[in-house]
C-alpha cells in the first residue's frame, strides 16, 4: 500500500538548530510545520520555553548536540529541563567515540540515563 503525502509528513521533524536561531525564526518554523502537517519541530533547548502556541505540532529538542560527547548526567539534566519547559520529545545525540569503539555498554548507559530523566517523553537516539 503506497504512502500518501500526509502519511510521510507525519514522520518528519522540521528542525532549526542554528546556534543563532531566534524565537521569531522558530515561530516561522512552527507555522510552516503546521501548514505541512509534519509531526514536530525540533529546536535547541536554550530556546525554551517558547512564548507562543505550537498548534498541532509537537515540540522536540536536541540533547547533547552536536557532539554527543557530553557527560550522561549533563544530557539527563538538559533533557529533564527541556521536558519541564514543554518539550514532548528529546533527540539525544549518541556518543560517537563510544559507538565507533564498540563500547556499547557505555552507549546503553548513556541512553538509559536520559530515558530515566524523561520517562514520559519520546526519546530518540540520533547520530550527528
Task: Put a short name on every predicted segment.
Residues 2, 9-46:
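An N-cap/entry alpha-helix motif that binds or orients negatively charged groups
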Residues 7-23, 60-76, 97-103, 126-128:
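Active-site mouth loops of central-metabolism enzymes
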Residues 25, 29, 78-82, 107-114:
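A general structural detector for well-ordered alpha-helical segments in enzyme core domains, enriched
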Residues 36-37, 42, 94-101:
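Glycine/Thr-rich beta-alpha phosphate-binding loop at enzyme active sites
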Residues 38-89:
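Active-site cofactor/substrate anionic-group-binding motifs, chiefly glycine-
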Residues 42-44, 88-94, 120-128:
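Short beta-strand segments at enzyme active-site cores
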Residues 45-67, 102-126:
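Alpha-helix-loop-beta-strand connector modules within alpha/beta enzyme cores
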